Amino acid sequence: LRLVDPVMGDGGEIYATYTPELCRAMGTLVDGADALMPNLTEASILTGRDYPGQDIDDAQVDEILGALLAAGAKNVVLKGIDRGDGMIRNYVASASTGVAGKQELAHAKLPFMTHGTGDAFASALCGAVMAGRPLAEAANIAGEFVRHAMESTQYQPNHEERGVSFELNLDELTALTRR
C-alpha cells in the first residue's frame, strides 16, 4: 500500500525547505500511488498548473483530479477546497471510475488555522484504510478526526503556535474506524 501525502506547500506557496528538484522528485511518487492526498497548492505543483486559490468550482476540481489520475495515481483525495460557505471540501476520485465518479466530502470549517492538520489527516486516513474502510469513508473519518482535534486544540494555551493536539481525540479515531 503506497499512500502519498506530498507535504510541499500550502496557501499557494511552496514550503521554504522545498527545492525545484524535490518537487520533481515528489512528482515521481504520483505514478502508482494507491492514494495521493494533495492540497490545492501541492496539486498545482504536481500538475504544473498555476495555483487557482482555495475557492474552485466543480469543473476545476474535475480538471485537477483528472490530471492527477492521468499522472498515474490510482486514487486521489484532493483536500481543502474552501468555497466561502463555512464548509471545507475534500474530493475523492479513482482511476477506475474517473472524475465522473468523484465523491465530495464536506466538513464544517473552524474559524482558525493550526499546523499539522495535513499530517493528522494522512495518518488517520491510513489507519482507516488499514482497518478495512473504503477510501472515501477513510477520508471522511480523517476529516472528522481532524475537525474534532482542532476543536479540542483551540482550548489549549498557545494553540496557534503549537499545532494540532490530536492525542486527545485518538480514542474517537479508534471508535470511528470500528463502526
Predicted regions and their residues:
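Short beta-strand/loop segments at the ligand-binding rim of alpha/beta enzyme cores
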Residues: 1-2
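Rossmann-like NAD(P)(H) cofactor-binding subdomain of soluble oxidoreductases
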Residues: 6, 10-18
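Glycine-rich beta-alpha junction loops
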Residues: 8-10, 42, 80-83, 108-111, ...
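Conserved phosphate/ATP/ADP-binding segment of small-molecule kinases
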Residues: 16-101
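Short, small-residue alpha-helix embedded
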Residues: 45, 112-135
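Phosphate-handling active-site elements
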Residues: 99-104, 128-142
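Short pre-catalytic strand/loop immediately N-terminal to key active-site residues, enriched for Gly-Thr
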Residues: 101-116
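Charged C-terminal helix
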Residues: 136-179
